[in-house]
Amino acid sequence: MLGAALRRCAVAATTWAGPRGLLHSSRTPGPAAAIQSVRCYSHGSHETDEEFDARWVTYFNKPDIDAWELRKGINTLVTYDLVPEPKIIDAALRACRRLNDFASTVRILEAVKDKAGPHKEIYPYVIQELRPTLNELGISTPEELGLDKV
């Protein structure tokens, strides 16, 4: 279906209206018209929860991580259909601190609260697990900053 739509678009882009309002092809359709539908299946091995956690902790613990990589990692992590483990969030908060990026720390904590959704017990658990790190790094939660009332 997508291939047919792309072929129609490619043909439409190469036609023009003649004197009687008829469409005339100025050239033959290009390679975009030859697109065929392809089925992509994942035949690779699946990543375990421990491997997933280790990958993200390693990513945020890179000593040379810059602000762009930090935001890219946070954005990618937020797109997953899960609430990150506290050890991943801990590594991300420490990366924010190394870069002196306080705004990203608040954004991470707000994203965790949002990802928890209707499960009200998840966010307090994560904050409880992160409390030593938050105190060590001098990071306030969005609730402590009054951002939950805005």
From Swiss-Prot:
On modification after translation, the UniProt record reads: In response to mitochondrial stress, the precursor protein is ubiquitinated by the SIFI complex in the cytoplasm before mitochondrial import, leading to its degradation. Within the SIFI complex, UBR4 initiates ubiquitin chain that are further elongated or branched by KCMF1.
Give the residue ranges of motif SIFI-degron. 2-17
Where does it reside? Mitochondrion inner membrane
Q: What GO terms fall under cellular component here?
A: mitochondrial inner membrane; respiratory chain complex IV
Q: Which cysteines are joined by disulfide bonds?
A: none
Q: Which GO terms describe its biological process?
A: mitochondrial electron transport, cytochrome c to oxygen
This protein's pathway reads:
Energy metabolism; oxidative phosphorylation
Q: What is its main location?
A: mitochondrion
Keyword presence, Phosphoprotein: yes
Q: At which residues is Phosphothreonine found?
A: T141
Q: Which UniProt keywords apply?
A: Acetylation, Heme, Iron, Membrane, Metal-binding, Mitochondrion, Mitochondrion inner membrane, Phosphoprotein, Transit peptide, Ubl conjugation
Whom does it interact with, and what assembly results? Component of the cytochrome c oxidase (complex IV, CIV), a multisubunit enzyme composed of 14 subunits. The complex is composed of a catalytic core of 3 subunits MT-CO1, MT-CO2 and MT-CO3, encoded in the mitochondrial DNA, and 11 supernumerary subunits COX4I, COX5A, COX5B, COX6A, COX6B, COX6C, COX7A, COX7B, COX7C, COX8 and NDUFA4, which are encoded in the nuclear genome.
* Stated role: Component of the cytochrome c oxidase, the last enzyme in the mitochondrial electron transport chain which drives oxidative phosphorylation. The respiratory chain contains 3 multisubunit complexes succinate dehydrogenase (complex II, CII), ubiquinol-cytochrome c oxidoreductase (cytochrome b-c1 complex, complex III, CIII) and cytochrome c oxidase (complex IV, CIV), that cooperate to transfer electrons derived from NADH and succinate to molecular oxygen, creating an electrochemical gradient over the inner membrane that drives transmembrane transport and the ATP synthase.
Q: Which family does it belong to?
A: Belongs to the cytochrome c oxidase subunit 5A family.
Q: What's the name of the protein?
A: Cytochrome c oxidase subunit 5A, mitochondrial
Q: Which gene encodes it?
A: COX5A
